[in-house]
Amino acid sequence: MRLIKIIILLLLVIGCKKKKVTESTSTVNTHLKNGMMVLCEGLFQQNNASISWVDFSNSAIDNQFFTTKTGRLLGDTGNDMQPYGCKIYIIVNVSSTVEVLDKSSGNSIKQISMMNNGIAKQPRSIAFYGSNAFVSCFDGYIDVIDTTSLEVIKRIKVGLNPEGLTVANSKLYVANSGGLNSPKMDSTVSVINLTSLEEYKKITVGKNPGAILSDNQGDVYVISRGNYSTISSKMVKINSVNDEVSAIFSEEISGIEKMESNLLVTYKSNANSVRKVGVFDVVNEVISVPELIKGTNFTTLYGVQYRSSNQKIYCFDAMNYTNTGFVKVFSSSGILETSYHVGLNPSKIVFYE
């Protein structure tokens, strides 16, 4: 009788262990909320791009979020991450893939291979319009991806090594950097008609254009990064009605982010100063708040992202590009409130309410 009781107890213990495995598996499908997904680029050719999940309710951080969800690595050099509809699209440059995740759960939907006859296209950035996603590829094309089938349906020839993308007035603006062709860099922005899906114009904006965005008035701003030595970076404004350059700003601006009706800019006051974050007034075309966030808050200021729902500014600190980085959160008046220790070279955030 005692032996039978022991056997029954063992069976109960085994049964409980199986339940725990099932419960653990079910957490993979938990709906994500009240947090942020952070893309960390990793280091070039080290295959260590990653995604961090930060839970705002308890400040818990999972720096292996993508691997936990998929059972594999994200890849080499994650350059962009954007939500659209019920999906999140992640651009992995050196691996030449676009990872598509279910936004609600973070689970993988599809990995899109970005190869052309065995040659890497090297995707860089992504933007959306209607039922299509547009991916800039370093081989000189914009790939059009159907957001339902998740297949590449067209390639549009543009300039050298296209990078940043933005949509304004039913047109796609493409910053052609030519960064891989130094010293013979590109200096143009391609304009693509989003009805015909054809390039119809190139606008000269200055050497090595990279980041680009449109404001609430429909004007387009692009950063021409120069040659990193004798030619400094600058910001150029494009009128999206006539597609002509309407203003060039003298400040050494290297980064831009939309903040309500104005822009956040990262810039240097002079060649010897550290980069800081200011506010650019798009109506009066001046930096109205020269030092909203001091550069001394960072080891390596890598970028800025604004969250309109709470009016907070999220700054990326890359920590000299070799140590795992931080997302530092500031109030709209520039006060540091908190920071989160994430992966290597954080650069993009998708927020969850």
Identify the function of each model-found stretch:
Residues 12-15:
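C-terminal motif of bacterial Sec signal peptides marking the signal peptidase cleavage site
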